[in-house]
């Protein structure tokens, strides 16, 4: 089974081709990683690669309640608990840097932090706050040129802290409607400067963030996650020239020599299915222009994963929710064992219930 075969990612020797996808779990009380989180990730260290939950590079990026950050010494030391737990089991782990941008509430931000976005366009719907329950999304402030420069520098600083904390690398969250994706999408980016307008200009923020992280961690330790055609968090799900824009972005990311391109298909959860030709061409453009591996994610089972690996469509396959209730997912796939079903009610609640209490298969 190719899914269970080793793979070399940059200079990392992965024991298999299963990636634990990034999943927000809201257990970081005070936005600081803790021993409970270390236990959770350590339990799942048999994955070839773990990508952490979205982690804010600055106070401005903390849109949700109880998500972790990596912008302080305390957070760095909290994450060190996690990386040591994973490495003790022989695993590898990347941190996912996620700036929420407009996806947030001022009630979830620490004092002095600001809700910022490419344009002053509010999200629809409501968001959970620990202090006042469900609340409407607040309208963000449009980022100035200085705000953009500061945000890029914050990604650089966060990447440096991540390496100090022992992470094997960094994934840029450019998917699912968060800040990098907000710059890519014309619905959330209505600017008419160098960071808005045509697709190439909307790509600029993502590329500048990638360069900043490469400067801190090296290209071989930097990946990016994208979700073309995604609709999560009010993204457009498709627009004129989207394929051209994303293929150009993949080309430029390849030229930077990134370790991997991680593409997400959310059609299993109701989003439009990405155009297969666009995904294939993005992967080809990334690889042929100097990029490393491809990771595909979204609704996979072992059979589909094996098909895409053997065809060369991808090098690695990311699994998300199956890892929640199956910390021993790799072993279950190896043995053909049935999978436990996760409890959705505990996906985002604090504490160990539905987090570290799922047993391995007997």
Language-model regions, residue ranges each:
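Flavin-dependent oxidoreductase catalytic cores
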Residues: 1-362
């Amino acid at each position: 089974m190719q899914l269970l075969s080793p793979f070399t990612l940059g200079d990392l020797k992965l024991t298999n081709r299963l990636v634990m996808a990034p999943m927000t779990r809201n257990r970081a009380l005070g936005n600081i990683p803790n021993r409970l989180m270390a236990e959770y990730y350590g339990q799942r260290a048999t994955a070839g690669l773990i990508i952490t939950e979205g982690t804010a590079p600055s106070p401005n990026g903390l849109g949700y309640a109880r998500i972790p950050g990596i912008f302080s010494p305390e957070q760095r030391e909290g994450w060190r608990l996690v990386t040591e737990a994973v490495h003790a089991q022989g695993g590898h782990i990347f941190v996912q840097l996620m700036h929420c941008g407009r996806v947030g509430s001022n009630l979830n931000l620490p004092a002095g932090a600001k809700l910022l976005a490419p344009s002053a366009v509010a999200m629809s719907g409501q968001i959970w706050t620990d202090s006042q329950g469900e609340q409407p999304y607040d309208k963000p402030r449009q980022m100035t040129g200085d705000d953009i420069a500061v945000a890029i520098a914050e990604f650089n600083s966060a990447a440096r802290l991540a390496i100090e904390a022992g992470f094997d690398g960094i994934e840029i969250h450019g998917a699912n409607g968060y800040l990098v994706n907000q710059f890519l999408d014309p619905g959330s980016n209505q600017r008419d400067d160098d960071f808005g307008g045509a697709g190439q200009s909307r790509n600029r923020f993502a590329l500048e963030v990638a360069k900043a992280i490469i400067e801190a961690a090296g290209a071989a330790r930097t990946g990016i996650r994208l979700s073309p055609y995604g609709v999560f968090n009010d993204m457009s799900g498709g627009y004129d020239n989207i394929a051209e824009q994303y293929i150009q972005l993949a080309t430029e990311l390849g030229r930077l020599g990134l370790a991997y391109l991680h593409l997400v298909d959310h059609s299993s959860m109701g989003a439009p299915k990405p155009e297969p030709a666009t995904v294939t061409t993005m992967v080809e453009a990334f690889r042929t222009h100097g990029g490393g591996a491809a990771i595909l994610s979204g609704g996979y089972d072992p059979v589909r994963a094996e098909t895409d690996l053997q065809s060369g469509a991808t090098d690695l396959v990311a699994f998300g929710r199956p890892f929640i209730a199956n910390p021993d997912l790799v072993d279950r796939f190896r043995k053909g064992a049935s999978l436990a079903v996760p409890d959705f009610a505990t996906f985002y609640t604090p504490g160990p219930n539905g987090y570290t209490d799922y047993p391995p298969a007997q």
